[in-house]
Amino acid sequence: MSAITARLPLGTSARVLTHGDFHPGNVLWHRGRISGVVDWSAARLDTRWYDLAYCRASVCVLLGPDIADRLAAAYSGIVGGTADELAVYDLMCVFSSRHYLAESLAADREQGHVPNHQMSLAHLDEHVRRALRRLDGTVS
């Protein structure tokens, strides 16, 4: 963990208004376009990479790491940035997502539901591997 936190770009990224809980469930759509974003109760000033990484973890669980990577490429193409910054925040958010999935799995089992959490966990594991490779410089 110290190797990861040593790479945190503390104080180097501009602070912007962030949502704090940005994921597909908080995005409203109308006729194929984003019409709004709801649930701003966790909003704060933070690095833009946190919201992107948080959303990528959710997208990864739902749709897989390739779609999460496409989201990052589209976003980075607009705002610029480095792989290191996003990789560190990806790791932070993925750990939170794994915890949430574990709690969700237990609750689902108690209610008799058997969703495909194993696939979601496999997606998150691949997301972690990709972030670690970016930090090691083996993937741009």
Per-region residue spans from a language model:
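Short beta-strand segments
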Residues: 17-19, 38, 90, 96-99
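Active-site activation/catalytic loop segments of kinase-like enzymes and analogous catalytic loops
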Residues: 49-80, 93-111
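Short, well-structured alpha-helical segments
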Residues: 1-5, 72, 86
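An alpha-helical support segment within catalytic cores of ATP-dependent transferases
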Residues: 1-20, 123-140
